[in-house]
């Protein structure tokens, strides 16, 4: 620990991302990346942009991308904010809407970056326990608070919350911002974007990393009332005006425009997820119902840590969380049909 660090930094427990191996000998099912490449339209748009214009700064407001997103979701471009991945958008959201004076609510089993942001910003947070089946304890989110954040579907459990429950939380929390983190919404869920017009306190955060195969470009966005978007812009422009580079902007626009490619990749991932879930249940695994591009699984007799280690020896990377209540579960990203068939072969070896 350095003597040059300030007291806040000394107390930080930073987020630990999933392993990114430097070689290619593994089948990577540990970071929820899309197994299919980006749309050819994305690659073509990036190639076209990669010319003399790179000497110029990008549009700090990303107006063309905002218009593209707004048109796609049927909202105004004044209701769209874009940033360098949804993690940055979430960080800006914590800075903008949450205060140390009031307690922020999120689940005890959820995306672990939320707690990191809260600690970094010295926020008070209450971790609300999920029920035994990992469903949301709805009533506990309907109490006096300084803000709510819920991923839908949840990570790492893959549990989905219906829009009627989202609406109940919004109705109760009209004086605080409710953030719905929809990183995985495109794999079987329904977005809460239609509630934006009626709930000025609703902020929806999404990413192009998962369903649009652009994890390497770092593109995230938020949708909400113009007053929420203005607040985010004020924070962004107090830190970094140019959060998206030229290649990311044109790549993101192209990804939204190629709807056919998006739908095809999405359908394949959902079909593979359902096949693998069924096969895992047949060999003794508990599989939490998923609306994401990953599944959350536990074997009835063999420990998750043991299976994790055995899979790694066999060239398969999955995610294991040594955390209370979920330390006997594995999170498995959905790969291609071929990758998941190999995963099934290897996991059968692990439990034989």
UniProtKB/Swiss-Prot annotation:
Name the Pfam families on file. Answer: Aminotran_1_2
GO MF annotation terms: histidinol-phosphate transaminase activity; pyridoxal phosphate binding
Q: Which residues carry this modification: N6-(pyridoxal phosphate)lysine?
A: 210
Identify the InterPro entries for this entry.
Aminotrans_II_pyridoxalP_BS, Aminotransferase_I/II_large, HisP_aminotrans, HistidinolP_aminotransfase, PyrdxlP-dep_Trfase, PyrdxlP-dep_Trfase_major, PyrdxlP-dep_Trfase_small
Cytoplasm in keyword set: no
SUPFAM superfamilies found in the cross-reference section: PLP-dependent transferases (SSF53383)
Name listed for the protein in its UniProt record:
Histidinol-phosphate aminotransferase
From which source organism is this entry?
Clostridium acetobutylicum (strain ATCC 824 / DSM 792 / JCM 1419 / IAM 19013 / LMG 5710 / NBRC 13948 / NRRL B-527 / VKM B-1787 / 2291 / W)
Identify the coding gene.
hisC
């Amino acid at each position: 620990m350095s003597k040059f660090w300030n007291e806040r930094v000394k107390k930080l427990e930073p987020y630990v991302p999933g392993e990114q191996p430097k070689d290619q000998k593994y089948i990577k099912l540990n970071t929820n990346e899309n197994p299919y490449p980006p749309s050819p339209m994305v690659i073509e748009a990036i190639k076209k942009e990669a010319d003399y214009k790179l000497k110029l700064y990008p549009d700090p407001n990303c107006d063309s991308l905002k218009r593209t997103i707004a048109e796609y979701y049927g909202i105004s471009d004044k209701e769209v904010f874009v940033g360098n991945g949804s993690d940055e958008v979430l960080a800006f959201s914590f800075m903008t809407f949450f205060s140390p004076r009031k307690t922020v609510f999120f689940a005890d089993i959820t995306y672990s970056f939320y707690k990191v942001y809260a600690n970094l910003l010295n926020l008070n947070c209450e971790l609300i326990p999920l029920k035994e089946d990992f469903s949301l304890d709805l009533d506990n989110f309907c109490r006096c608070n300084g803000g709510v954040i819920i991923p839908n579907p949840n990570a790492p459990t893959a549990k989905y919350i219906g829009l009627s429950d989202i609406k109940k939380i919004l109705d109760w929390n009209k004086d605080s911002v409710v953030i719905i983190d929809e990183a995985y919404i495109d794999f079987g869920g329904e977005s809460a974007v239609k509630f934006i017009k009626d709930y000025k306190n609703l902020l929806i955060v999404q990413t192009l990393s998962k369903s649009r195969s652009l994890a390497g470009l770092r593109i995230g966005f938020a949708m909400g009332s113009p007053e929420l978007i203005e607040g985010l812009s004020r924070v962004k422009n107090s830190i970094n005006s140019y959060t998206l580079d030229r290649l990311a902007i044109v790549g993101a626009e192209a990804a939204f425009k190629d709807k056919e490619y998006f739908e095809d990749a999405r359908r394949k991932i959902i079909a593979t997820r359902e096949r693998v879930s069924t096969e895992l249940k047949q060999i003794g695994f508990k599989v939490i119902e998923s609306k994401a591009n990953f599944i959350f699984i536990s074997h009835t007799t063999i420990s998750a840590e043991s299976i994790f280690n055995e899979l790694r020896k066999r060239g398969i990377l999955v995610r294991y969380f040594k955390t209370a209540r979920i330390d006997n579960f594995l999170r498995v990203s959905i790969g291609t049909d071929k990758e998941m068939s190999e995963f099934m072969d290897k996991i059968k070896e692990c439990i034989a």
